[in-house]
Each structure stands twice: as structure tokens, then as C-alpha cells.
Amino acid sequence: MFKGDSVIIPRKTGTGAGDSSIEGPILTCANKGLRSERCRPRARGCLTSLMIVLCGILSLPCLASTTDDAAPSFRLPDGARPTRYSLDLTVDPRSPAFHGVATIEIELKRATRVIWLNQKSLTIRRVAVSKMGGSYRPAVWETREEFLMVRSPFAIGPGKVDLRVDYDAMLNDKSSVGAYRKKSGNDWYVYTSFTPIDARRAFPCFDEPGYKAPWAVTLHIKREDVAVANGPDASSTDEADGMKRVAFKETQPLASEVVAFAVGPFDIEDAGVAGEKRIPVRIITPRGRMADAAAARAATAELLPREEAYTGIAYPWDKLDHIAVLDLPFGATENPGLITYRDSDFLVSPAKDTPRRVAMLRKTMAHEMAHQWFGNLVTQAWWDDTWLSEGFATWMAAKVTNTDLPENAQGLAMVQARDQMMRLDAKGKRPVRLEMRTREQTDDVYDLVVYQKGAATLKMVEDWVGEGPFRVAIRRYLQEHAMGNATTAELERTIEEKTGVKVTPVMDGMLNRVGYPLIRFRLADAKLLVDQEPVGGGTPWVVPICIHLENAKRRCELLDTARVEIPVEGAQDDGPRHRHAWIWTNAYGSGYYRAVLDEEMLDEVLDRGYSELSEAERLSLLVDIKAVTQPDH
């Protein structure tokens, strides 16, 4: 804590000169400044200016405090941005720790002497700073919780500076976060799992999705081991003591959470090439498990071209490895060039496999490959917009695997997912977009709501504005933000520009509210009378209502008040029975609302319209009937 002109810092600190990590209280030699082992504590009340002069005379790395010294609470200050990373790591899966040197090129917005970045549980050995093209000079540093503060010995910025950090990190074998190791039989393996904020456990970095930069990775490993990473192998050179140096091609800009590497006695199989650029595809498994990956081999060549065709952009990365990972905490992770899958999901003996399991694997692979555009090529600017990654990948995976199904089953998966999501959403758990202000809140980043309600939002808007115009808008969105970041507002703006439909009120409601509307329909005098009841209360929803009317094309109307009347020509028959034409009020089956028809309308659509509905519309009718009549089932 801070007391007067002196600072008591019960944290790890160092000067950057030699192995100087220190635990325990350290007194600084400047007012609220960083400490140096060579600095001496002064009596309380001594003049700060005199101390700075003394430190300067003695050539000590002691600097006056600035507002840049204030520790971040969660989000990094915006004054520094990484433009390139170089990682040089020595990794032996048999050891519980590894050594690393991280060199980071940084662009500074303004003059400063302090740089903040992320670290967690790293043992910092040395830190040095260099102006571009100059020699490195030792810097003082301090670790505070999940941050590393570096104080330069000279003024830096605005402009570029290089930061080099020499450190050690743990390879945890008790959990599966950060860089960790697992044993299978007699073999040890190292894997990484960084999403959303655990890259900082493996190397110092700007561990936020808005900070994307190229990564050059070099691994020093035992000669009998294999190393893989995001980029293709660039070179492999034998070193002393039974080691070898494996360098990988520098990546395109990536967020830290999708940087990945793995080391161990892997089996690797060439799975051919895929996509417009005929990128190489490989399957990677623990030793002796390749036969259990049979179902995965053909999937990439079949699914990747479908995603390229929709996005209009060739697969953006230089290779595509699918690797089975021991005890991966997620089902799969979309690291560019090195997609990881939980081994129990990815590897199944052909003798025990089932068509259902294969279909689920293909959908998982389609989801992770969709992330190569939605999440990696274009990355959410902050975690409150994680749905731009997960919602899009869920929606895309359903789209590209739909043709794997028999015709009478196509489109049903999204309706089933919508129904399940609405049952959960009725409980008011959380909205799709949730502001992230603490580490604890990031535990909720990958909630099911983000995936399924995010995907349902996209499907509803797609059917409302039209599949063709929506596709044009999505392609434009990807082109505008390629290799960068995006926000929900930017997506909404692009959709509106390319479709001419004002989608923002609809999407904002879907993404920022919990619940959904229950909408009641009845016919009177060739008008469809519509009343909505927000489930969970609140103001009326703004939602498109798409109707399928007998002998007419499907059409959509915007419901933006509690009650509307929609003219429906031909809705009433003038024949002797005076029957209403049948109407189903959730055409396409994608509207995120419960449709409740009055008795006469329901009888008509069940008796005369059911056979004319699409499979998705039939299912949406049935699930809405069940949800309203059996709400607890």
C-alpha cells in the first residue's frame, strides 16, 4: 500500500539487471516510484526532487512517479499497442517449468517511461528496453497481480520501442489452463489453452482481443519430440545436449488468446489439401492414436470450401492442423492453423463410432473452421462482443452442415436450438452482450446464451432482410475488418448499408435484453391482430414477424409496439363456409418469439396448412404449441 512519500510494495520487483526477482516489502527511492536494489530508503518527508537528483548522480534507475504508474484494475491502458511479438521458448514436457524470452515491438501513443502489460504467475528474470535500432538497456519492473509494469531508464514515445522480457513459467499438470502438460502412458505432452485471458500465464503480452499482432515463435525441444504451432515449420536445427531448434513462420495478426503450440511425441498424418489456396491439412494425435481419427480426415476438404464460398474469402492462414489434445477444457478451440479438440471427442475407434457421433464431430469442426473468419480474421474488440465470434460460428456451422442431412431434416437443428434457448432465456439468466469489467466476469464469456441466442439473432435477421442481401452485408463486414477488430455497432451499420433495412433496434434488443416476446395472433376483417407480452416484463420488443399465408408468398412486418394490425389480403374466404385462409405466423421458423394462435387460426393451419409448411415451419409450430401448453416441459 502507499504511505506518504515512501511506497511499501509487497510484490515481486526487479531492476532488470541480473536475476533480481525479490519477494517481500521493498522501499523505493523516489516518490511513489519503482524500486531498485541499489536505491536506499529515505526518511519520510525528504524532498522528492532531491531524491531524483541523487538517483541521477549515482546513475540509478530511479524515476519520478507519473500518472502512468497507476495500476490498471482490469483493462490495460490504451497508450501502448503491440505491433509484433517474438517468442523464444525452451520446452521439455517432462519438466514442470519452461524458460522463455519474449520480445515485443510496441507503438506508443505519447511520451512516457512506463509500459503496462499482462502476466500471471511468471517469474521475471530480466527486462530490457530499446528504442528502435538502438541497444537494449536494463529496465526496472514490477509485477502487480496480473500485470507487469516496466519503467524505462530513458524517455520513450511517441513511436516505437522494443521490450524484451526474460522469464520462467510453470507447466501445470493439475489443470488445463495456460501452457500445461499431460501424461499418457509413459509419454508427456505440452499443450496450450489461452482463451479467454490465460496467454499471460505463458508469456508477457497484451492479453486482450483488441491487441492483434504478428507472432514469430521459436521452440527449443528434445530431438525426439515434435513441436507444432500456429504457423508452418520454417526451419529445424539440431543443438547441443540432444536439443533442436524449431522455428515457425511468422503469423498474420493474432490476438494472444489464439496463439498456440504443442510439444510431445505426436503422430502426424497428412490429410491432403483443402480450399481455394490448397492449404495443407494435417491430423495430429498422441502417439498410437491416429487410427481413431478416421472420421476427421475427410471433413476439412468437404466443409472448408463451403465456408469459403459463403464468405467470398479464401481460408486466411497458411496451414490447417487439427490436433487431439489431452484434457482440453473446451470441446475445441479455434487457434489459427492449429485447431485443438478434446481428445475424447476427436478420437473414437472406428469399430465403436456412430453416425450421430460423426455428425457431431463434423459440426464441431465446421464451427472451429468458421472461426477462421469469424473470430480470427475479424476479432471482437472486447469480450462483451464475443457473440461476434461464437454466435457467427454457431450459425455458420449449422448452415454448412445442413446439406449433410436428408432433405426432410434440413433446417431443423436451428429450430430445435432456438426452442431450447428460449426455454433457458425465459429464466432471465443473462443477455448475449454482457459488460466485462473483472477477471471473474470473463468466466461467463462462453455462456451458452452467447452461442445460441447470438446464432438465433443472425438467423432471424437473415430471413427477415433476405438471404442474398444478408450475405452481401456479411462479406462486406469481413472485408472491412479483415485482420482487425469489430464491434456489434459496426456489424449493424454494415447490414443496414447493404440491405436498406434498419436492423439495429431488433438486434440491440435481442443482444442486450434477456427473455423474448410471447405474441398472440387472431384474424378479424382481413386483418391480423397482433398483441405481444414480453416474457419477464419490460417494454415491448422490436421484432420482425414473418408470416406464411395460404396461396401467398412469405412476408415480414416489423412489430415495434405492444399491438399492431397487419392487413392480410385474402385472409378470409367469401365462400359459404366463411373459412379464414390459414396463416402461420413464424415463417422460416426463425423468429425469436413464441407464436400463439387463436383457436380458429390454429385449427386452420393444422387442418389445411400443415402439409404446405416447410419442415422448419412445422417444427416451429409444434414446439411453440408445446411451450405454451406445457411450459414446464
Task: Show the residue positions of the predicted features.
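Hydrophobic alpha-helical and helix-loop surface patches within well-folded domains
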Residues: 3, 146, 248, 277-537
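N-terminal, polar/Ser/Thr-rich
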Residues: 54, 58, 62-99, 185-188, ...
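Ligand-binding face of N-terminal immunoglobulin V-set domains in extracellular IgSF glycoproteins
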Residues: 98-120
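Extended, low-hydrophobicity, Ser/Thr/Pro/Gly-biased non-transmembrane segments
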Residues: 105, 164-270, 293, 435, ...
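Aromatic/His-enriched, Gly/Pro-containing loop or helix-boundary segments
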Residues: 114, 136-157, 193, 197-200, ...
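A surface-exposed beta-strand-loop module
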Residues: 121-184, 241-242, 566-577
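Non-catalytic accessory/interaction domains
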Residues: 218-221, 244, 287, 370, ...
